[in-house]
Swiss-Prot record:
Residues where Mg(2+) binds: D486, D492
Name the record gives this protein: Polyribonucleotide nucleotidyltransferase
Organism: Yersinia enterocolitica
Keywords attached to this entry: Cytoplasm, Magnesium, Metal-binding, Nucleotidyltransferase, RNA-binding, Transferase
Example of a GO MF term: 3'-5'-RNA exonuclease activity
Gene Ontology biological process terms from the UniProt entry: mRNA catabolic process; RNA processing
Amino acid sequence: MLTPIIRKFQYGQHTVTIETGMMARQATAAVMVSMDDTAVFVTVVGQKKAKPGQSFFPLTVNYQERTYAAGRIPGSFFRREGRPSEGETLTSRLIDRPIRPLFPDSFLNEVQVIATVVSVNPQINPDIVALIGASAALSLSGIPFNGPIGAARVGFINDQYVLNPTTDELKESRLDLVVAGTAGAVLMVESEADILSEDQMLGAVVFGHEQQQVVIENINALVAEAGKPKWDWHAEPVNEALHARVAELAAARLGDAYRITEKQERYTQVDAIKADVTEALLAQDDTLDAAEIQDILGSVEKDVVRSRVLRGEPRIDGREKDMIRGLDVRTGVLPRTHGSALFTRGETQALVTATLGTARDAQNIDELMGERTDSFLLHYNFPPYSVGETGMVGSPKRREIGHGRLAKRGVLAVMPSPSEFPYTVRVVSEITESNGSSSMASVCGASLALMDAGVPIKAAVAGIAMGLVKEDENFVVLSDILGDEDHLGDMDFKVAGSRDGITALQMDIKIEGITREIMQVALNQAKGARLHILGVMEQAISTPRGDISEFAPRIYTMKINPEKIKDVIGKGGSVIRALTDETGTTIDIEADGTIKIAATDGDKAKHAIRRIEEITAEIEVNRIYAGKVTRIVDFGAFVAIGGGKEGLVHISQIADKRVDKVTDYLQMGQEVPVKVIEVDRQGRIRLSMKEATTPDAEAPAPEAAE
């Protein structure tokens, strides 16, 4: 008999249910979490033993959406789900980031978390539900895990914070922020904002953390009722004697190595020191474990760098805590791209391009929450050469997708609306060098490339990565962190924004005890750094260029009566296809009658506009048009009068005298003036040649000629 154990509670405006004991009983733990008809089934499986020689923590998080959750069948050829979408990859990372720091440092057993969306309410995004499910399943499993965590989405509507806003509410919100953390500490923040102040962003983080306590309380209650016994796992005791011997041999030498400012030279020296120390110790005692020595060397290395920062000494590259590396900013570096920039900050460099396209180039995204079109794309590429390595080159990895989305969030708030700038815009950031904060370099480069392309962004934006070193009550916030400072520090804190406020904030915190005061210091220090970078960027380009590139398509907009759309499209698209072939343009028609014409040549666009005006022009009775004979029949001739319209000249209307044979007067392709004498209810046009040639007839309308 299956007996579910259920916790149900109110979470803001939503009801959350966590259920365990019914499904996947062979998994280490499994829960079904639902929030107002959005349900995610989350399982956790942990291996009891680590693999021999395992040197890192093999945690895998897979978030997957099933189309049956929305009552749909996949549209792919095989009619089943395939590789993870970009949205699924981002949500997998969102779950991974706050749970990874909560496993013990020396825990190396393989753990897999799988979150499957099995029901979806279009108003409730499954990501928060999946985060709650991962927290609950890990807490129930007995695996060494210092949770649970809570998770909340925070909106900002009418100057008020909103807990877990619906999809419709988010459209009105100036903020979309996800925060996750334990009862006492924030661990992860992911957000995009419409240029909010530092205080407003910090307030949102604190609000979300306070509100999610109800989640943690209910997970703890569920664990008390249904949790599995804690694993009998203990960290291996530290070999203090060996640690002391390693520190004696390596600490001073590593300290000297970490005064080398050039990254590759420093890495070479550090690797040589580690190899020397390992070789020396093994020569003294061949029973020692080389892997253990390497682990201790890593710990000594971390202590050397951190203690120097906490003592107020210069950082690895000689900077003070709030100094920014040297900047080099250039625009228009690629001759044929629509916009380009090369942004260099120390040993981090991004080559960024902006490309303008038409509405047809927009990305159609079929998500579980519904279909949408995205006309602003930002892609981030991180080739192995950027860090002096070799490696696989191919489709983007999780990290590249995540960094690209963060950079996009940093720029999105300043992009013009489609009515202001009716282009699809694609930005690509090629990381050509990397030593910390390449995603924020991408934000800076994107802003520069967009302005170089003539995109009327509302303001320039820049990004900066902050770090933290904390021991007890002593802490130091670092501006513009290097890769080593990110790896050896306690926090990775990325902020993007304009002079007026923040557009994106991402935090990943590895320790507990990060207070509001520390976050306030970091945000204020980041603001100073951001303004400094913007000042340098503005020396290269301060406003968007007045015109787009000569190589970019120019989009001209016109409006027609929606009832005339069918005339422009024609039967089976025949008219619009002929128009695009004739004029060499791209033509897009919207349901409200808005027509967008894209062309690299202004004359071609004008020709297309003129032809559309002809097609949609109202036929005026008693008006004379320049026509062309298209068909000859026994009872008269059909004459095209422009705009794809055709009328009949009856045999009696060809001449003032009797006409026995139409071909005596007219030939195919002959141009003749005709007068419109009637348009009947069915839109059929009656024409007359004889009335058009009377002495008092007006001249034919030249604009109607083919």
